[in-house]
Amino acid sequence: MLISRQERARICSDSELGAGNLLARLKAYGRPLDEPVLRTDGTWRAPDGSRPEVLTLGELYAVVEAYAGWYAAHGVRPRDPVALHSSSSAEFAVNFLALTSLGAIPSFVNGNLAPETAREYVRRQGAVGAFTDESHREVLTDAGLGFHVTADAIRPEHRASLPASYPYRHDPTDPVLISHSSGTTGMPKGVPHTHRTLMYAQVHRLRYSTGTDMERTLVGLPGAHNAMVATLLYCLLLRTDIKLLSSQRGADVLDTVEEFRPTTVLAFAGTFGEMAAEDLTRRDLSSVQVWFNTGDAAHEAHIRALVAHGSHQKVDRDLRRVRVDGSVFVDGLGSSEAGYSVFHNRHTKDTDAYARRIGKPISFAEAAVLSEDGIPLPPGQIGRLGLKSPTLTPGYWNDSLTWNRMRLGGYWLTGDLAHQDEDGNFYHLDRAPDAVRTRAGIVFSTRTEELLLAELPELADCTVVGVAPDGVRADWDGDGEGEAYALLQVTDEGAADAADAAGGDEAWTERVNSVLTAAGYPPVHRALRMKPDDVAKGATGKVLKRVMRDRFAAEEQHA
């Protein structure tokens, strides 16, 4: 049951509400304690020793207070960072609610980070202690932290240790979370968000959207990402039936869709790409009305595969709501720093706004395509994408140097290359480090991948990387030249083997370049087949093109 109009008005006018005090405000609103509010996937152990799959609001209060009591008894105070290193989305959610209720700052560490990276990242945060799951216990054992706890140490009786001032009263500028960037360019950057920045978009959505398509919401986002927390906050306010999934594997998300029957599914583009590569005709996706992507913009081929399933409501010519076949895919471009997907591009099976179009910025944000000296460029010219938004992080945790280097002309630079059309729509071309300067022109890797996936139905996915000689920089910021390679994953092994027999990599290269040439894009040097397991991915599922470049260059050198 979603909130009433009266509840919505009360929430939107609540000047005390923020990301750090949501549970306290729900109590003030008089929400019933026996109402189910959160579903988990069984990966989290509760203080009573059970592994509940559903928590009521009253049970969530009790759990959060037990965790908060344990932390308070072990010296955690307001503004203390506490590291959380786990693979369980529910553990991140519960710890976020508990630590913020004390005024402390949960510092999320993705469970997929390499151990040495996780240790160094936590050291840079200045964390006073850590919570881990059992599988990550050893990673931070010798990290010199004040305490190190797992779920089995926290008991219901720890509620008695809550401080007299509980819950903490936040200022809008108080930090309530440190999550981290994907780490695709090296060490992940600590990205804090405040009581205000993490809640701003959620209240905006409540003002302007009924949210009826989110009545049953499946969250396939990484638990360690602030997008999961933002979704949790919104769903708790909206009173949706929300389930947190710890796995971002496409097959696991599809299994859960069939079991949970959600109306909305949230995930990153990599997860949606894996889902689209499955035989979806063998899946029951009829419950889905909306797929919501955030992070990197998704590829057309993957979107089209998903919107063919499910259904959604639209308003007909007589202004009546009617249900039609096919779901909606909301393609959001965002980042940890942006705090919310500033761009939303809505797709159905009957729309065609593709070609890396990401649309226009949401009403509360401002975007521009900038020249190298920070001047907004006219339509058609390629430049750096810059953002201004009340949801933007106030900076990188303990790294103001990097933060200030990513500001230009009053905008925060996303690291993306883009251009606009005459109607003000933005188009995403590539990440600046992933563009490849070649003798034939600049190969924008993401744009090239988009075209190949749309034109070659045999491809399940593809990755374009650049390789340059030692000491030569051939990306957007470089002045040298390299060679671009298209690394292909195919859907039909039989057809692929037949193509190999007819010419192997040379045949694939010819096919790929014929598509690129017809579109007026620079060709690649070679196209090569590869298996999904050969693709290096980061903690959040993004392809690590930096790693792929280095690996491929080494292989070419020894070939």
UniProtKB/Swiss-Prot annotation:
Residues that, per the record, bind Mg(2+): S181, E337
SUPFAM superfamilies the record matches: Acetyl-CoA synthetase-like
Domain of life of the source: Bacteria
The protein's required cofactors: Mg(2+)
Pfam families named among the record's database cross-references: AMP-binding (PF00501)
Keywords: ATP-binding, Ligase, Magnesium, Metal-binding, Nucleotide-binding
Gene Ontology MF annotations: ATP binding; CoA-ligase activity; metal ion binding
Enzyme Commission numbers on file: 6.7.1.2
Ligand binding (ATP): A227, G332, S336, D416, R437
Protein role: Ligase involved in the biosynthesis of avenalumic acid (AVA). Catalyzes the diazotization of 3-aminoavenalumic acid (3-AAA) to 3-diazoavenalumic acid (3-DAA). It can also act on 3-aminocoumaric acid (3-ACA) and 3-amino-4-hydroxybenzoic acid (3,4-AHBA) with lower activity.
Protein name: 3-aminoavenalumate diazotase
UniProt organism field: Streptomyces sp
